[in-house]
A protein has these predicted regions:
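The feature marks the mature, well-folded catalytic cores of soluble enzymes
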Residues: 1-219
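Short cysteine clusters
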Residues: 222
Length: 222
């Protein structure tokens, strides 16, 4: 984790990046990247709505999928009134639209984006990202620097395996059989005439050590 954080900071430093956007990723949370970058004076903005609300509260996500489910509409309305000066009697739809507009501005001109990855296809070099809000696709499309942080257990052999794994990855998300959007990345894109800088950081974080243990290896099936 420490090596990954240092590597990411070095990448951002060589381009003098001081402001980045981030998408939802449990791996990024695992290595403590955001507090590390903020300690280095790099501003990080969450682009997932729930994670953005948690960031405003200066709290970690309540749930891996629904980050701010522990907050009521009135609590969020009070928060937005304090932070942005909007009226306190906003309904959930108004709050969502206001948040989307804030994040749209952040995603339209980022210096860099950091994402996780749902799957890494080894035989084609494809990075697969799943989402429901559209923030990942927007972020990756505009950022001149894209850093992907993924653990080695995201590696799969063939893209054919996704026919099973993509529906399965949404199995535990309430009221949704499959994710709304998929992004398949096979290399850097061209942004305003320049080729995007794309980095993939593979994280071991003791996974290979756990795999060697007959009983403990089962936790990696979660």
């Amino acid at each position: 984790a420490d090596d990954a954080n240092q590597m990411i900071y070095d990448i951002l430093s060589q381009d003098r990046v001081k402001r980045i956007i981030k998408t939802k990723s449990s791996t990024i949370e695992e290595i403590g990247l955001i507090p590390y970058l903020e300690m280095k004076k790099i501003k990080v903005t969450e682009t997932n709505i729930g994670d953005f609300i948690c960031q405003l509260y200066n709290q970690v996500p309540y749930n891996i999928v629904h980050s701010a489910d522990n907050k009521t509409n009135s609590q969020i309305a009070d928060l937005y009134s304090d932070k942005f000066g909007i009226k306190q009697n906003c309904n959930p739809k108004q709050l969502t639209l206001y948040t989307k507009q804030l994040l749209k501005e952040e995603m339209s001109n980022p210096s860099a984006v950091i994402t996780g990855a749902n799957f890494l296809v080894s035989n084609s070099g494809t990075i697969v990202l799943t989402e429901n809000e559209g923030n990942i696709l927007k972020s990756c499309s505009f950022a001149p620097i894209h850093i992907v942080v993924a653990s080695i257990n995201k590696l799969i052999t063939s893209i054919d395996e996704l026919s099973v794994l993509l529906p399965l990855s949404s199995f535990y998300e309430p009221n949704r059989n499959i994710s709304s959007l998929y992004t398949f990345i096979n290399g850097p894109v061209e942004i305003e005439g320049q080729l995007q800088k794309l980095y993939l950081i593979l994280l071991n974080n003791n996974i290979t050590e756990i795999l060697e243990k007959e009983i403990q290896r089962d936790i990696l099936s979660c």
